[in-house]
Amino acid sequence: MQFFAKQNCQVNLLTNNPSSNPRFIMEINSAATLTLVSLLTLPILLALLTRKSSSKKRRPPGPWNLPLVGGLLHLLRSHPQVALRELASKYGPVMFLRMGQIDTVVVSSPAAAQEVLRDKDVMFASRPSLLVSEIFCYDNLDVGFAPYGAYWRMLRKLCTVELLSTKVVRQLAPVRNDETLTLVRNIKAASSGHGGGGGKKPVTLARLLTTCTNTITAKAAFGQACGVELQEQFLTALDVGLKFSGGFCFGDLFPSLRFIDAMTGLRSRLWRARGQLDSVFDKIIAQCEEHQGDSLVNVLLRIRDQGDLEFPFGTTNIKAIILDMFTGGTETTSSAAEWVMSELMRNPEVMAKVQAEVRRVFDNKSPQDHEGLIDNLRYMKMVIKETMRLNPVLPLLMPHLCRETCDIGGYEVVEGTRVVINSWAMARSPEYWDDAEEFKPERFEDGMADYKGSRFEYLPFGTGRRRCPGDTFGMVLLELIVARLLYYFDWSLPAGMQPDDVDMDFVVTATTRRKNHLQLVASPYKLAPIQI
């Protein structure tokens, strides 16, 4: 007890005489300093907290994100466009999702898409740089991936004025006529003989369509068809590029870990494919340099040699533009034609109606006149539109990059955010379409929706500044191919198959392809003899 009493006495003495305790004086000084610092920094902290809180309030809603991987697990349940539609049904048409290390806003409504693609399109007119665009697309020198700016505007002008104008597309009519007739002859030759059970031999359309569209694009680009070897080399390289161009490569989602793409061999695969492209394009360019002409490559070569542009424009730039032309002209058109035939085989009543229209218009007409009669095929045009609604070649439009912090649908989108437009979801939404999952071409009878983006729930080629510059070239070719397939052949399924047996499974790369190639039996139309 005496010990505790003694200690208490000492404490009381120290308390009553603080000046005799240096430690107490230091604590007083420290407390004063902390108080002063707190008073000075409190406004700054409050401002930062308020700003952060405000930013959180205005950021688009979205699902939970895990450390490191963000919300990527949400995309594993299905194809990206399907998974994103399911998430949007819960979180809304403007949704935030962190894909790995990439902040992404997903747009799934026409109103929000209009903001991105028309009302504020300058703010979203650029593209993110992807692994594929850097290696396969010649370091973003192509029209599709070039950053928004003066160089891209120059490329866009070249495409719309010199390379893919309405006048140029019209001048290529003889090429389309010849090669689509060659397609007809090749289908007849491939179907000759008998399949199992004594029936006709089924034809795999995909390869024949790809050969046709590639040859037409080649003749448009440099005046002659590629040899078989060059064509195979190009198509092999193109398959690699398309497979990894959706922006879902590891390095595209985790930029700080891009070295992993080298460890997995992805970079080397892309460089090998780039080498194949170089080999093909070098030969094409050499041929065009030897033989002066009016082909699209010759036009580019003259522009290169004149040196009048404000930017360096060399052979690499020409290769990047050729790649865009071949990709759009070959892959998207052939895939779309195969989807049209798939839908028609699943819907026999529509097939009968559209085929009757084509034959009514084409009967007793010269093949050279067919393309000029396409505008009379109103129902066929509806069939193609409806096919592209349900099976868009680009289910997720090419990603946009936010160049300046702004709002979409009342939510803040920060500069540097990647913006993805789910055109597939909008085209299948019951909010905008009656019987949205049904194949009903008549829904386009009013003519309100076109391929240019007049209605934002229907964007097969996008719209705005970054709309596909080759859409006219592609649609003219697609319509002629479909018309001639319907005119020259009666189509049926292989023995034992019913319309409901036609699977519509797909795989998504940069474009949407059928997972399993369509096989059909082609019987020549008796009133339209095919000369082989």
From Swiss-Prot:
A Pfam family it matches: p450
Keywords: Heme, Iron, Membrane, Metal-binding, Monooxygenase, Oxidoreductase, Plant defense, Transmembrane, Transmembrane helix
Top-level taxon of the source organism: Eukaryota
Cellular compartments per GO CC: membrane
Localization per record: Membrane
UniProt cofactor(s): heme
Binding sites annotated in the UniProt record for heme: C468
Entry protein name: Cytochrome P450 99A2
Species of the source: Oryza sativa subsp. japonica (Rice)
Gene designation per UniProt: CYP99A2
